Amino acid sequence: MQLFKLKTRLSEFDSFADFAKEFTKEDLIITNEFLYNPYMRGLNLPCRFIMQEQYGMGEPSDEMINHILADIQLENYTRVIAVGGGTVIDISKLFTLRGIVNATDAFERKIPIEKARQLVILPTTCGTG
């Protein structure tokens, strides 16, 4: 059974500023502070930023994901943008699902695996994505 299908498109930009030109208030960016401070902070982008390390370190856990979900549950976003390594990307993939309010519900398939948001990934380490 095929749960979902990814349609990949590769793009190239000269800088993060060029990449971010089309970001809107409906974008949710999940990243790390060590990337945000030098590359994103000065751009004054209208989107919501989540700094993954503020919710825990290491591999993503149900607890980490649920804390982030609790902070953004009332926000409307149409696109999830992951800028970072494996943890950031894994969390971002989950946040594209329709109706997700609890990580365990998604992992146990208590909610339909239905994509509701576009996913954009900017991997920052080799082997991620």
What residues fall within each predicted segment?
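ATP/NTP phosphate-donor binding region
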Residues: 1-79
